[in-house]
Amino acid sequence: MNAVNLMARPEALTFAPEQSALIVVDMQNAYASQGGYLDLAGFDVSTTAPVIENIKTAVAAAREAGMTIVWFQNGWDSDYLEAGGPGSPNFHKSNALKTMRRRPELHGKLLAKGGWDYQLVDELTPLPGDIVLPKPRYSGFFNTPLDSMLRARNIRHLVFTGIATNVCVESTLRDGFFLEYFGVVLEDATHQAGPPFAQQAALFNIETFFGWVSDVQRFCDALSPAALARIA
């Protein structure tokens, strides 16, 4: 099995594509589109288009190299029972739930399964063989089969893309760290919820304490046929 060398911060990371997964976190209309939840809650989504294109590029490279592709969709049932009631901290901290309480006309529209907000953006489409998982909280490891599905495939290295870097991406990468997964985030294939310093703080946390940081060009270079041929 071939291993590739990915240039990253704070140091390069070596992994076998067949034992690695590209994780696409919450690339839904809610997080990346005008009129979606983040936009309606007052977060800037005006610069997500390049992120979408970079994720498309990363997905294509990962698929060609034989990596597993995992797509997450964050949200709940249309009655929001899965979101938790007042006894859950999620009820009090979820900006989607708070926005709907402020604007009752949005109830049943934000992050509700089956709705436009919940759907992946049109530019990104899972293919047969990809893993598509719903998740009810920020971390993709919480109340999902992600861990068991990865272990069944002998996957130990996770490459992260998606929105939001400082919330669901970082939360999932951190939980993976605690479960002994090696996590690397492609910084130009992610976008923060909040001001730019939130992106920089999340990337600092990841490269300093929990994982590695790279970018889409370096990722594609590492997975290119020429690179794979050199190490075959």
From Swiss-Prot:
One of its GO terms (biological process) is uracil catabolic process. The active site is at 26 (proton acceptor), 135, 168 (nucleophile). The keyword Hydrolase applies. Its EC number is 3.5.1.110. It catalyses: (Z)-3-ureidoacrylate + H2O + H(+) = (Z)-3-aminoacrylate + NH4(+) + CO2; (Z)-3-ureidoacrylate + H2O = (Z)-3-aminoacrylate + carbamate + H(+); (Z)-2-methylureidoacrylate + H2O + H(+) = (Z)-2-methylaminoacrylate + NH4(+) + CO2. It holds the Pfam family Isochorismatase. The keyword Hydrolase applies. Keywords: Hydrolase. GO terms for molecular function: hydrolase activity, acting on carbon-nitrogen (but not peptide) bonds, in linear amides. InterPro entries: Isochorismatase-like_dom, Isochorismatase-like_hydrls, Isochorismatase-like_sf, RutB. Hydrolyzes ureidoacrylate to form aminoacrylate and carbamate. The carbamate hydrolyzes spontaneously, thereby releasing one of the nitrogen atoms of the pyrimidine ring as ammonia and one of its carbon atoms as CO2. PANTHER family: ISOCHORISMATASE-LIKE DOMAIN-CONTAINING PROTEIN (PTHR43540:SF6), PEROXYUREIDOACRYLATE/UREIDOACRYLATE AMIDOHYDROLASE-RELATED (PTHR43540). Belongs to the isochorismatase family. RutB subfamily. This is Ureidoacrylate amidohydrolase RutB. The lineage of its organism: Bacteria, Pseudomonadati, Pseudomonadota, Gammaproteobacteria, Enterobacterales. The gene is rutB.
